[in-house]
């Protein structure tokens, strides 16, 4: 698929925050490393979708800075980007402090915060 054909949809920040909170809470309450790893797989897919939307908007704005639609989208992501970063940092801390960290690192790699 060509870049120009990639569909763009603005994220629903309310839904994004709800999903981050759910993932973080479920990770904290996981009863095993396997359970945390499965939640991490969900997290990875979820954040990839969020990041794709953000990147599409930013790149399309950079390609044509006169496009008002993508200028507004870029402004939106400039606003919500720090909020998303806070959730990602919080999730990273939960993994770092996990009692199953050794298991997760055997599946993923070293966990840094």
Descriptions of predicted regions:
Residues 33-45, 70-71:
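Short, charged, amphipathic alpha-helical segments
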Residues 111-113:
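Conserved small/polar residues in nucleotide/adenosyl-binding loops
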Residues 45-62, 76-95:
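Amphipathic alpha-helical coiled-coil segments
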